[in-house]
């Protein structure tokens, strides 16, 4: 995969340039565009992934299925499809926004800051996973309600963006409705 960049955003969340992804994630990360996607299988189970230990931010932490950054000139939907293929080796369908205006700022234990405008989507996996071990060290298909209980009981074991996304009542309801259809 070619070197990824992030799309930098101004105070009005409008694109203002790009920066190499690795250089962007520092102790003073500029605001940039990202996405988060929650994948479900045909049985309505959620794919929860554990970030590789080689990740710069939140290594080894459990998180939602796939996250990433749209490249300049790429739609969020195109970026989600690209990252699902790269990280999980999976094809998806029924890509649906569930929390389109999510944004957050969080600092990991190493001091690396995430500072993202990060629309959240749900999608359905349509093929068998072929996980990229440089991105994902473990994964599990689980019932959404079980994952929610785990997030409430042990939020420190999960990425802050996953906890924040699921903590939004409207987003949680949309995810629950999505997995039940």
Curated annotation (Swiss-Prot):
Pfam families: NUDIX. Pathway: Isoprenoid biosynthesis; dimethylallyl diphosphate biosynthesis; dimethylallyl diphosphate from isopentenyl diphosphate: step 1/1. Gene3D superfamilies: Nucleoside Triphosphate Pyrophosphohydrolase. Its main location: cytoplasm. InterPro entries: Idi_bact, IsopentenylPP_isomerase_typ1, NUDIX_hydrolase-like_dom_sf, NUDIX_hydrolase_dom. Its EC number is 5.3.3.2. Keywords: Cytoplasm, Isomerase, Isoprene biosynthesis, Magnesium, Manganese, Metal-binding. Its cofactor is Mg(2+); Mn(2+). Residues 30-164 form the Nudix hydrolase domain. GO terms for cellular component: cytoplasm. GO terms for molecular function: isopentenyl-diphosphate delta-isomerase activity; metal ion binding. NCBIfam families: IPP_isom_1, PRK03759.1. This is Isopentenyl-diphosphate Delta-isomerase.
């Amino acid at each position: 995969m070619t070197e990824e960049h992030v799309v930098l955003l101004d105070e009005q969340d409008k694109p203002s340039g790009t920066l190499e992804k690795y250089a962007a994630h520092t102790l003073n990360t500029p605001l940039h565009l990202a996405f988060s996607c929650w994948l479900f299988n045909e049985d309505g189970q959620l794919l929860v992934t554990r970030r590789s230990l080689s990740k710069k931010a939140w290594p080894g932490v459990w998180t939602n299925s796939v996250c990433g950054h749209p490249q300049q000139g790429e739609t969020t939907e195109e970026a989600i499809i690209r990252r699902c293929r790269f990280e999980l080796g999976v094809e998806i369908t029924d890509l649906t926004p569930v929390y389109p205006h999510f944004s957050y700022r969080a600092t990991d234990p190493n001091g690396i800051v995430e500072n993202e405008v990060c629309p959240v989507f749900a999608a359905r996996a349509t093929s068998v996973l072929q996980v990229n071990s440089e991105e994902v060290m473990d994964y599990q298909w689980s019932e959404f309600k079980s994952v929610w209980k785990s997030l409430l009981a042990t939020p420190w074991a999960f990425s802050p963006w996953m906890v924040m996304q699921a903590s939004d009542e409207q987003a949680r309801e949309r995810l629950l409705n999505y997995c039940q259809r």
